[in-house]
Amino acid sequence: MAIVGLGTDIAEIERVEKALSRSGDAFAERILSQSEFEIYQELKQKGRFLAKRFAAKEAASKALGTGIAHGVTFHDFTISNDENGKPMLTLSGKALELSQKSHIANIHLTISDERHYAVATVIFES
């Protein structure tokens, strides 16, 4: 196995909360997959959840080498959690297509947050 991509991103939670207050759920719908949006709707700390997902998807797009561009969208990345709470990243659409061309076999994702910031790192291995 070799590392074929590494990405990190940090998001300011307050900035995401302000974007939510300006645009409501439209901002969340732009970032979240359908399954993520269903979870989001049930939460009290929507801004914190969205900041963590935003950072994770930006980190994944950086690890892919495209950023959110070249046909890759936020909806190409879905974050879920296993039974122990470990974050899991699933690719679809253009991101999946590009990952297959790069022979990505393993995806590692870590997400963390504290009072003001959410941070995520993604590693793609062949």
Curated annotation (Swiss-Prot):
It is an enzyme of class 2 (transferase). Pfam families: ACPS. GO terms for molecular function: holo-[acyl-carrier-protein] synthase activity; magnesium ion binding. Its EC number is 2.7.8.7. SUPFAM superfamilies: 4'-phosphopantetheinyl transferase. Its cofactor is Mg(2+). Keywords: Cytoplasm, Fatty acid biosynthesis, Fatty acid metabolism, Lipid biosynthesis, Lipid metabolism, Magnesium, Metal-binding, Transferase. It catalyses: apo-[ACP] + CoA = holo-[ACP] + adenosine 3',5'-bisphosphate + H(+). InterPro entries: 4-PPantetheinyl_Trfase_dom (IPR008278), 4-PPantetheinyl_Trfase_dom_sf (IPR037143), ACPS (IPR002582), Ppantetheine-prot_Trfase_dom (IPR004568). It is found in: Cytoplasm. Mg(2+) binds at D9, E58. The keyword Transferase applies. GO terms for biological process: fatty acid biosynthetic process. GO terms for cellular component: cytoplasm. Coiled coil: none annotated. Belongs to the P-Pant transferase superfamily. AcpS family. Transfers the 4'-phosphopantetheine moiety from coenzyme A to a Ser of acyl-carrier-protein. This is Holo-[acyl-carrier-protein] synthase. It comes from Aliivibrio fischeri (strain MJ11).
